[in-house]
Design a protein with these regions (language model features):
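Secretory targeting signals
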Residues: 1-9, 20
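Flexible, surface-exposed loop/linker segments and immediately adjacent secondary-structure boundaries
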Residues: 14-25, 29-65, 72, 80-230
Length: 230
């Protein structure tokens, strides 16, 4: 194989994430987290203000299924629940729903309900759902980013496979298979039957980054598929 002195895309992204301080200061020190086992630590970054069940968040706060997570204006919270890592931006309201088959105290997530705000989420859970005021999204082990408002949801399948359906129109549904931010969508709360979901081009100013996805996956001992060499 011919040698190339220019770093390939995966290596370049990793270097950018490290230089930006997104990785090493956040990755759990315990070997169990790096080996992909669940860690008991929840909060890895807190910028500004956040609350869990109405209580202020600090670096020792534990977040688990059944919790209600909110963030203040201009804030950002990076946290892990089991094998699921999330980045929640400011002015967000998120409910973490437990898995139906799990016992009390389990960290396995059954679903996420984003009432408002902006969420980046990485998970290998299959059969999980994310709900917003206008969309129901079936997750099959993916990285996703979404912004939930009262009238529409912005949704990007960063990688993986999802089933998307409009809450107010069962005929508006779509399966998206994405390798790398291939098909962002708007899902509306109102519209013509069968036309509540609209593909959109990539935004001129990205609202989430590969470095953030790399960071989130690293927190649970994984790497995104787009960083893996073919």
């Amino acid at each position: 194989m011919k040698e190339n002195s220019t770093p390939d895309l995966p290596r370049r992204l990793l270097l950018q994430a490290i230089s930006a301080g997104l990785l090493w200061s956040l990755i759990p020190a315990s070997s169990s987290a790096l080996e992909g086992e669940a860690t008991t630590k929840s909060v890895f970054r807190l910028k500004g203000r956040a609350w869990v069940n109405g209580n202020p968040v600090d670096m020792n706060t534990l977040i688990k299924p059944n919790d209600i997570v909110k963030t203040g204006h201009g804030s950002e919270l990076v946290f892990v629940v089991g094998h699921h890592a999330m980045l929640l931006r400011g002015r967000s309201h998120l409910v973490i729903e437990p898995h139906e088959s799990e016992s009390v105290g389990s960290l396995l997530i059954g679903g996420l309900r984003l009432f408002a705000g902006k969420l980046l989420s990485v998970s290998r859970n299959k059969g999980m759902r994310i709900n917003t005021p206008s969309a129901t999204i079936g997750i099959r082990g993916t990285g996703v980013y979404l912004e939930a408002g009262p009238e529409r949801t912005y949704f990007c399948t960063c990688y993986g496979e999802v089933d998307v359906q409009a809450v107010n129109d069962p005929d508006s549904k779509e399966t998206v298979v994405s390798a790398h931010h291939d098909k962002p969508l708007y899902i509306y709360g109102k519209g013509q039957p069968g036309q509540f979901i609209h593909p959109i081009p990539r935004l001129p100013v990205p609202n989430h980054s590969d470095e953030e996805l790399i960071m989130a996956e690293a927190l649970v001992g994984r790497v995104p598929p787009f960083t893996e060499k073919s």
